[in-house]
């Protein structure tokens, strides 16, 4: 049986912790290891932070967090209706940042990819971005390869 949650919240840095805790609590149904929980929390933190800093350029907006559990697979989707990403493939390169003047390292997508089994980013300039992340638990790795991912409207990296 598929289990789902959805949370919409203000795109402010204080809510990054809320998103992490909500997904971690939801994930406990799979009896994950502490390391698995930390991995997912880190990926969620990076996706939410990207939405706040880059999607809305820290001017506020709304973020939608959706998560589902089915057959031992966690899917997390973080969506913003911000400025969007002009070149997703380039943005996903380690060390690439649009905020070179700040302390941002350009490693957000690299961390998401390191801690989750699969990451897909879809974006349209002026319309926003969705970051889809999957992680398989307890023998569900084979199932993960069977997940159908619809064709994005923009370049993707999986």
Predicted regions and their residues:
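Conserved short strand/loop->alpha-helix "switch" segment adjacent to the catalytic nucleotide/phosphoryl-transfer site
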Residues: 20-45
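A conserved short beta-strand within the histidine kinase catalytic ATPase domain
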Residues: 61-67
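Short beta-strand-loop-beta element adjacent to the nucleotide/active-site pocket used for signaling
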Residues: 68-76
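Glycine-rich/acidic phosphate-handling loop/turn and adjacent ATP-lid/helix
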Residues: 79-103
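Glycine-rich phosphate-binding loop
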Residues: 101-116
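A short beta-strand-to-loop motif within the catalytic HATPase_c
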Residues: 121-125
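Glycine-rich GHKL/ HATPase_c ATP-binding element in histidine kinases
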Residues: 127-131
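Single conserved hydrophobic/aromatic residue that forms the stacking wall/gate
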Residues: 147-158
């Amino acid at each position: 049986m598929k289990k789902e949650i959805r949370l919409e919240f203000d795109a402010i840095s204080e809510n990054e912790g809320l998103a992490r805790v909500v997904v971690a609590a939801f994930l406990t149904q799979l009896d994950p290891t502490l390391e698995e929980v930390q991995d997912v929390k880190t990926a969620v933190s990076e996706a939410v932070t990207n939405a706040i800093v880059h999607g809305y350029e820290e001017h506020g907006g709304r973020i939608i967090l959706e998560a589902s559990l089915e057959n031992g697979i966690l899917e997390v989707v973080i969506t913003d209706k911000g400025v969007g990403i002009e070149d997703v493939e380039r943005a996903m390169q380690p060390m690439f940042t649009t905020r070179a003047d700040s302390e941002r390292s350009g490693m957000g997508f690299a961390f998401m990819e390191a801690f989750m089994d699969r990451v897909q980013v879809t974006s349209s300039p002026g319309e926003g971005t969705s970051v889809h992340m999957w992680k398989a638990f307890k023998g569900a790795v084979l199932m993960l390869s069977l997940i159908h991912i619809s064709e994005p409207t923009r370049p993707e990296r999986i």
